[in-house]
Regions:
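Nucleic-acid nuclease catalytic cores
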Residues: 73-188
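C-terminal end-of-chain micro-motif
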Residues: 1, 189-190
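Charged, glycine-rich intrinsically disordered N-terminal tails and low-complexity linkers that flank
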Residues: 1-64, 68
Length: 190
């Protein structure tokens, strides 16, 4: 399978590729309106312009959070393409992936099923089977001022173990079907 590595993510267009953050859609129920809307986006027939203040803040703080880890050899924004699977890694070394997640500090951070699934596919796509979610709690002022310094006391590194069975038994069979449907421009059946 041909792999393409890029170090700069140049487009926010999510059509024609299946990303790691799409994993819950890949392994979920394909007979819903939500799936249909998502699949139309993948086929390039619908555009998702979802953005909110929390997403904007997370995107703006991502590199500062990674820099605050002070990890030598840290690469940012690596993109890996395997056929129709596209993995965008926030940060990585040759031995570990660092996936940044920001959250409102007033709430406790938990690794959701969606985040866990995304992490699994990032590890699969990259071949790097060690991953930390770097959770950073944002305070109210952080949403209004993206120039605030990173407070290391608000950083949490949470290990996510690689689950080969999930990838082989749940993810890859469905990814294969979706990849073929993307190439043919049709809807999948499972």
């Amino acid at each position: 399978m041909k792999e393409i590595y890029q170090t700069l993510i140049q487009s926010q267009d999510r059509s024609y590729y299946i990303g790691c953050s799409d994993t819950s859609m890949v392994v979920g129920n394909w007979k819903t309106k939500t799936f249909e809307k998502w699949w139309l986006e993948k086929l390039g027939l619908n555009k998702n312009k979802l953005s909110n203040e929390a997403m904007k803040a997370g995107n703006n703080y991502e590199h500062k959070i990674l820099d605050s880890l002070e990890i030598k050899e840290l690469e940012k924004d690596k993109q890996i393409i395997k056929d129709r699977l596209r993995a965008n890694l926030d940060g990585n070394t040759n031995a570990c992936i660092y996936e940044v997640k920001t959250y409102n500090i007033a709430k406790e951070f938990k690794v959701s099923k969606q985040y866990w699934r995304q992490a699994q596919v990032e590890m699969y796509a990259s071949g790097i089977h060690k991953l930390y979610i770097v959770a950073y709690g944002l305070q109210e002022d952080d949403y209004n001022n993206y120039f605030n310094e990173i407070d290391k006391n608000r950083l949490k590194l949470i290990n996510v173990d690689y689950d080969k069975k999930f990838i082989e038994n749940e993810y890859l069979p469905k990814l294969k079907v979706l990849t073929e449907c993307l190439k043919k421009g049709g809807f999948p059946e499972w």
